[in-house]
Amino acid sequence: VRVAFDSRAKGDPRGIGRYVRCILEALRETAEPGSVITETQRPRRSDVFHSPWLDGAHLRCPCPSVITLHDLVNLKGRGEYLRTGVRFKLRYLAVQRADRVIVPTQVVANDAQQHLDIDSERITVIPEAADASMYPRGAEEIAAVRARYALPAEYLLWVGGMLHPERRKRVADLAQAPRRMPLVLVGPARPWAHELPDVTLTGQVSDDELAALYSGAHALVFPSDDEGFGLPSVEALACGTPVVACEAPALREVLGDRATFVEVGDMEGLLEAGARALRPAPPPPAWSWADAARATWRVYAAAIAQSHPVSTRRAPRLPRGAF
């Protein structure tokens, strides 16, 4: 099988970059003899094209296409979606035309059916996983990362991108809520995040540093009210750190009884539950990137077997509520 894979997001410090790096490595490790993966955004002379993000979606693709749809947060927030303009509307149309759509949770699958009118037969749920670098670190590594970022002995941790003040992530609400334990925010940040009160920002960190930060935290707090998967929560569990989250449907699907949940929007309750969290944390879900890669290879095979010529595919329509 000749796979064209759009890997442009590989260097992105956010979750999309982690997904691309991990699934690419696992796809190569699980490939059948003779299968070839070419990193390109031009799906020529290929049996199947995989765009692992919305930005790489092709409205007209010369070969069977697979798109990974991580969430539909922008589309569900109708006002935000309308402001994104024609470019994003066309990308959603490209998702509708794809031969197969990969999503990380059944929650996103349901959203894709409801908002994009995608047949359930074309959607495959393939969960994500913690990278192999995410494992409990020893006291020496934890002490080193604490010293490097001037962290206290005990702290609550939040991990994610702070490039834009996304309302659904509730980072500002979290920072402003009363708490009895210091809060550390990890991830790439723009100036607005540096104005948040009484928090420590580490900026972007290496994988080894991130694992040590997870391992040294009292708990990971996850205040989002909407997520597609919530990979930091699985990474934290892999490092032995308890997780406390708001009742976002996808987080509940992924974590089940492995986390403590509070009502959406209850930042004080979230922080208090984080301060009361106890080790040892439950293990993460028993799912690996190798499992995800094998499932993805099966999706490629299905896309190739059931693909229709571009000219015979159903004409796309704008998502519900687009205008």
Regions found by a protein language model. Name each.
Residues 1-323:
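Carbohydrate transferase catalytic cores enriched for Leloir-type hexosyltransferases
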